[in-house]
């Protein structure tokens, strides 16, 4: 009986040509998504390919602590650390959401030494779109 030839990139053979090897990335875009419950920081190159990401939940914060400014600062630091090692020097920051971690994550990015070209707020605002949910009564 003939042996079957394993497919390239199948689960058994592992990934061939993966993008995990470090690349030189001088410029990039940092996305901060800050909700009331969590903060997610994603770093991409100029073309939009994700280089690294981190969230308050992936940094070990659970429950309501994920929405704190300290958790956002830790998440931003973790996401930026791998990118600085790959040689990123300049970045554009896009912040989305009303959360408490907006400023803390931005401060952590400042401290990393990356030059920020533009800081843009891309929070979606409705122009009187859908009806808002009813107010909570506690």
Curated annotation (Swiss-Prot):
Residues 1-21 are annotated as: Disordered. One of its GO terms (biological process) is translation. It is found in: Plastid, Chloroplast. Its main location: plastid. Residues 9-21 have a biased composition (Basic residues). PROSITE patterns: RIBOSOMAL_S11 (PS00054). SUPFAM superfamilies: Translational machinery components. GO terms for cellular component: chloroplast; ribonucleoprotein complex; ribosome. Keywords: Chloroplast, Plastid, Ribonucleoprotein, Ribosomal protein, RNA-binding, rRNA-binding. One of its GO terms (molecular function) is structural constituent of ribosome. Part of the 30S ribosomal subunit. PANTHER family: 40S RIBOSOMAL PROTEIN S14/30S RIBOSOMAL PROTEIN S11. Belongs to the universal ribosomal protein uS11 family. This is Small ribosomal subunit protein uS11c. It comes from Pisum sativum.
């Amino acid at each position: 009986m003939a042996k079957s030839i394993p497919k390239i990139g199948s689960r058994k053979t592992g990934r061939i040509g993966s993008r995990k090897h470090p690349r030189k990335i001088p410029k990039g875009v940092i996305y901060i998504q800050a909700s009331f419950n969590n903060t997610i920081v994603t770093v991409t190159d100029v073309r939009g390919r994700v280089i690294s990401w981190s969230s308050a939940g992936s940094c070990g914060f659970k429950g309501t602590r994920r929405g704190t400014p300290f958790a956002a600062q830790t998440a931003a630091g973790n996401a930026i650390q791998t990118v600085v090692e790959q040689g990123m020097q300049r970045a554009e920051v896009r912040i989305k959401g009303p959360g408490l971690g907006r400023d803390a994550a931005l401060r952590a990015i400042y401290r990393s030494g990356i030059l920020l070209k533009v800081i843009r707020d891309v929070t979606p605002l409705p122009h009187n779109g859908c009806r808002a949910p009813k107010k909570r009564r506690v």
